[in-house]
Design a protein with these regions (language model features):
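Short acidic/polar hinge/loop motifs at secondary-structure boundaries
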Residues: 181-211, 229-230, 556
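Gram-negative outer-membrane beta-barrel transporters
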Residues: 418, 586-589, 605-685, 760-764
């Protein structure tokens, strides 16, 4: 299969016409002279285009000789147009300097020629400019239609809901930061566990959102979509920030620019380097103090080593520990056993840490090809004490468990080769990608009592490897119609060597095995530019559902990599200059839906599922500084082989909407009033237990000057009682009445945040 990919790519890229020209250069801020990343660059009236990279560099290749108008623009910058004359065989360089201006949605374009599958780019760019980012939760909420829930004192990864999926902690949504994968394969707590708390929100510069299985560079975990976060290449200024709030909350942040505008480290060409550190503490709003502590550190260097080579180095460290109150049963609150913010087992909690190192080398080769290579390493530890069923299994010691990872090592490489090839009057953009990821970890699941280990359920050593390759081709068939076709090939090796307790005898028995499986995932997407303000798209693609190595070895499902098939039609359009709308009608079928059972260390196959829905996102500029936004999402999902009276997909969101009104000024007062709503939905197969919906208001206010900023954030302005994480669970309580041994199956929940006020102050230097 690798050979077929390479041959297909060679045939595509060697069909080039002769004597074409190349235009390359740098986009910089007109005041500071600093290179700017993410600026759209293209030739007026011509299909295709590109965006400046981390060093502000851009390249347009395979151009016919002639005179063009080069346009460059980005949100918050005044668009610039420059006439350019190119000769056959010429490679011309130039520098574009763009000036800042007030944000104007009239400047937003509806297409992304270099990355057409990023149809939410316009929406995402607007949100990144308008919404303040103060937490990992804020970052994830930038994904249109995505909802999150936290249910362990702030220490665990958030539960994610998107496109009719309860993604658990990341099973069906792939997350990365600077090319580093966040999701954990075969994690001891949940497949695809995506703990994003090691990211300092103020360092994030860009988010790319891809919904559905339509993009070839995403494989594992990307059933419902993927989010690519990118940290800043450079700081506009150094910053010190302090935040204090209710419930003993404190946060400190320090970000230092190490090079400024005129210092150099490895070369005399453009370079940047900075460090950032964050400390956070809170006791939270529960009756039992949570003692949550987190530290984050980041260092990043980006530099142009030569005219054709750039290097990015990144290192980060994160550590966290906490106590938790866990999910509580409704009957416990109703009968007065505990308060709404109480706990059945106050000894829950955990600790975790992650250290990352990454190097990215980007090289411009002959024929205007670009080779990008990344190597990365992560070291990860995790230990979590939970009690999901209280005294259902053991009426004396209780049902507390400890899920632990000891020394997970992640080794990875990704490489892409990009090239533009002239095919007559058209330019074919080809990307050949290859990569591998290896996870090596100790996984333990044990019984515990008040955080003291009592016996082992399963334990062993994980080795899991993914090798992948893909070929992605984008070709403008006409001036309006663009074709994107791709194919991805994945190979997985699942290896687990350990023990498993016999359910009858409780004796530990060997659990060992090794299995290799592969899968091919083709994609086909069409984009039609109906007018400068209307783009239509039709997308389709195969993907696959992720799987846990322990479930694979135990034979939980004959189909190791269940297929996913998705379709989508929609449009990004501007009915008036100041209104941007993205709308999509989508469908997704899963061959089998796999659910990880955390307290058993196994995987449950719930059978095939079918989902469809409608996503609408709109951004409107009411005046020069006033903006309105809303996302509305409807999802319908069912288990297709289950009886009609028991075919719901538990916890799958049905209707969600978020939105807000924002006043944004470059200096002085800014503010935002926002809402979020998720509808009630079935929590079990037959819908007899329902997770309760909520409607909340949040607010942000800030005052900014050149050297300082002060602000306030308020969550749940109306102090509504709401449930954050919710599950249908069978549990038993040791109340004075001694509940029946079989316990009760009902809704369990983690209470949502009450009114929560935080104040912050920043100094820029």
């Amino acid at each position: 299969m690798h050979g077929l990919l390479v041959v297909a790519w060679l045939l595509a890229t060697n069909a080039s016409a002769q004597n074409t020209a190349t235009l390359r250069g740098i986009v910089a801020d007109s005041l500071s002279g600093q290179p700017l990343a993410g600026v759209s660059v293209g030739l007026q009236g011509q299909p295709g285009g590109t965006a400046s990279d981390a060093l502000g560099q851009f390249r347009l290749g395979g151009l016919a000789a002639g005179t063009y108008t080069l346009r460059a623009g980005a949100l918050g910058y005044r668009a610039q147009a420059v006439p350019v004359t190119l000769k056959a065989g010429e490679s011309q360089r130039l520098t574009l300097r763009v000036a800042t201006t007030t944000l104007s949605l009239a400047e937003v374009t509806v297409s992304q020629p270099r990355d057409p599958n990023q149809s939410l780019a316009a929406i995402s760019h607007i949100d990144q400019v308008l919404r303040p980012m103060n937490s990992a939760q804020d970052l994830l909420r930038l994904v249109p239609g995505l909802f999150i829930a936290q249910h362990a004192g702030g220490g665990k990864a958030e539960q994610i809901f998107l496109r009719g999926f309860d993604c658990d902690h990341g099973t069906d949504f792939a997350v990365s930061i600077d090319g580093l994968p966040v999701n954990m394969v075969s994690h001891t707590h949940g497949q695809g566990y995506a703990d994003f708390h090691f990211v300092i929100p103020e360092t994030v510069e860009q988010l790319k959102v891809y919904k559905g299985p339509y993009t070839a560079r995403f494989g594992d975990f990307a059933t419902s979509g993927a989010g690519e976060f990118v940290t800043k290449t450079r700081l506009d200024h150094s910053q010190a920030k302090i935040e204090v709030g209710q419930f003993d909350t404190f946060r400190g942040l320090l970000m230092l620019d190490l090079l400024g505008n005129d210092r150099h480290l490895l070369s005399k060409k453009p370079e940047s380097a900075y460090v950032a550190a964050e400390y956070y503490f809170t006791n939270s709003y529960f009756d039992a103090k949570q003692h949550f502590k987190r530290f984050n550190g980041l260092a990043k260097y980006t530099g142009q080593l030569s005219d054709n080579t750039s290097l990015t180095l990144l290192g980060s460290h994160f550590t966290s520990n906490w106590d938790a109150s866990g999910q509580i049963p409704e009957r416990g609150v109703r009968e007065g056993v505990i308060s709404r913010f109480g706990s059945i087992d106050p000894t829950e909690g955990g600790r975790t840490s992650r250290t990352n190192a990454s190097a990215i080398l980007t090289t411009t080769l002959g024929h205007d090809a670009v080779l990008r290579q990344q190597v990365y390493y992560s070291r990860y530890d995790f230990s979590l004490f939970s009690n999901f069923t209280f005294f259902l299994q053991d009426s004396v010691k209780g049902d507390e468990i400890n899920q632990r990872e000891t020394g997970r090592n992640i080794y990875g490489y990704t490489g892409t080769y990009d090239r533009d090839t002239r095919l007559g009057a058209r330019t074919l953009h080809s990307t050949l990608g290859m990569g591998t990821r290896i996870d090596d970890a100790g996984l333990d699941l044990r019984h515990a009592q008040r955080r003291q280990i009592t016996d082992t359920i399963t334990a062993g050593r994980l080795f899991e490897q993914n090798i992948n390759a893909y070929l992605d081709e984008t070709l403008p068939l006409t001036d309006r119609l663009t074709l994107n076709a791709a194919v991805r090939f994945d190979v997985f090796t699942f290896d687990f060597r350990g023990v498993l307790a016999n359910e009858a005898t409780k004796e530990l028995e060997p659990l060992r095995g090794r299995l290799t499986r592969s899968i091919v995932s083709p994609k086909l997407n069409l984009y039609y530019q109906l007018s400068p303000t209307v783009q239509l798209f039709a997308r389709s693609g195969f993907g696959f559902h992720s799987n846990d190595a322990r479930g694979v070895i135990r034979g939980a499902n004959e189909t190791v990599l269940p297929r996913a098939l998705g379709y989508e039609v929609g449009s990004t359009f501007k009915p008036v200059p100041n209104l941007v709308v993205n709308a999509a009608l989508w469908s997704l079928h899963l061959q089998n839906e796999l659910v990880y059972i955390g307290d058993d260390g196994n995987v449950e196959n719930t059978g095939p599922t079918q989902r469809y829905g409608v996503d609408v996102a709109a951004r409107y500029q009411l005046s020069r500084r006033l903006f309105l936004d809303t996302d509305v999402n409807y999802n319908h999902g069912r288990q297709t082989d289950a009886p009609a009276d028991a075919n719901y997909i538990p916890l799958a969101p049905t209707f969600t909407t978020i939105g807000g009104l924002t006043y944004k000024a470059p200096k002085g007062l800014s503010g935002s009033l926002r809402y979020r709503h998720i509808d009630s939905r079935p929590a079990n197969d037959d819908g007899s237990i329902r997770a309760r919906g909520y409607f909340l208001f949040d607010a942000v206010l800030s005052y900014t000057k050149a050297r300082f900023q002060i602000g306030a954030t308020a969550e749940n302005l109306l102090n509504v009682q709401w449930n954050q994480a919710q599950f249908a669970t069978q549990t038993r309580l040791l109340t004075p009445q001694r509940e029946r041994p079989a316990g009760f199956d009902e809704l369990h929940f983690t209470p949502g945040t009450p009114f929560y006020l935080k104040l912050n102050a920043s100094v820029f230097f």
